[in-house]
């Protein structure tokens, strides 16, 4: 799963 990557992507946007 790429949940971690998804979370990192969202955090990077913020």
Curated annotation (Swiss-Prot):
Modified residues (Leucine amide): 14
Localization terms from the record: Secreted
Principal localisation: secreted
GO cellular component: extracellular region
Keyword annotations: Amidation, Amphibian defense peptide, Secreted
Organs and tissues of expression: Expressed by the skin glands.
A single GO BP: defense response
Domain of life from the UniProt record: Eukaryota
Similarity comment: family membership: Belongs to the frog skin active peptide (FSAP) family. Brevinin subfamily.
Protein's job: Lacks antibacterial activity against Gram-positive or Gram-negative bacteria.
Protein name: Fallaxidin-3.1.1
Taxonomic path: Eukaryota, Metazoa, Chordata, Craniata, Vertebrata
